[in-house]
């Protein structure tokens, strides 16, 4: 308890009683230090706690609860005039030593960007580097362009208009239905290679939840989200939403009771 308190994971009384508060503190420590999360201060966790590599607690700020988590999909679209309040150019705020921002015009929500910095710092501490942000905020107009381009490609292959639109919706959101409109969704990649199966993808899927992010489109949730799995697409929902969704194996629709 004393060591957990020193590192900021525990704020209760140091009394030697391993109760619920201590167990939750151990779980939080394990999550933020890359350990198996079981809430038990066994040998591996104990050794980590007293090592030089033990990290101080990282608390990611959560935006206004009235705004988070925001559900955006075909059933809950945003309007053509929707624009997030606090967008920043990621090139201006993301340290190049941690991550490459693919385009100079890529924007994102400021709080989400700060959470990403914390996440990539943790990844670097674990020896995982080479990250790239390929997409962030998209306007309604830009999403319309992407949607129309994909429909045109299918039409060129001989699809009917109806089938081209249906096929497009498996991988490209309708204008207004894309999470990228929020500024809270990002495509994380590795330059020059397929992301799936890389050490970066594996690390991201294990640890992003601890920094307020979720893997938004997963294989076992395709029937609920309406999208094919995208291992590169993360969405900021803030803590504790992200860890609750992970621990309960819920996608955003399920978590908000919309499934």
Feature locations, PLM:
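Extracytoplasmic cell-surface/polysaccharide-interacting catalytic and binding patches
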Residues: 2-3, 7, 20-27, 31, ...
């Amino acid at each position: 308890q004393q060591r957990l308190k020193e590192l900021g994971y525990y704020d209760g009384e140091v009394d030697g009683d391993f109760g619920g508060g201590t167990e939750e503190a151990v779980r939080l420590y394990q999550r933020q230090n890359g350990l198996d999360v079981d809430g038990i201060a066994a040998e591996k966790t104990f050794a980590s706690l007293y090592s030089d590599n033990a990290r101080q607690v990282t608390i990611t700020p959560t935006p206004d609860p009235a705004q988070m988590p925001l559900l955006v999909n075909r059933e809950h679209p945003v309007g053509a005039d929707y624009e997030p309040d606090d967008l920043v150019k990621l090139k201006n705020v993301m340290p190049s030593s941690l991550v490459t921002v693919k385009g100079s015009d890529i924007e994102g929500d400021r709080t989400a960007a700060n959470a990403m910095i914390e996440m990539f710092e943790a990844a670097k501490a674990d020896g995982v580097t080479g990250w790239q942000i390929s997409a962030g905020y998209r306007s309604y107009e830009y999403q319309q362009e992407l949607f129309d381009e994909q429909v045109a490609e299918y039409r060129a292959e001989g699809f009917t208009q109806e089938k081209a639109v249906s096929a497009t919706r498996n991988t490209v959101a309708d204008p207004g239905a894309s999470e990228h409109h929020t500024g809270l969704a990002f495509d994380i990649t590795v330059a020059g290679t397929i992301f799936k199966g890389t050490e970066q993808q594996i690390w991201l899927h294990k640890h992003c939840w601890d920094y307020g992010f979720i893997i938004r489109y997963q294989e076992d949730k395709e029937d609920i989200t309406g999208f094919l799995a995208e291992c590169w697409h993360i969405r900021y929902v803030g803590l504790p939403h992200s860890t609750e969704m992970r621990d309960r194996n819920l996608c955003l629709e399920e978590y908000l009771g919309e499934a």
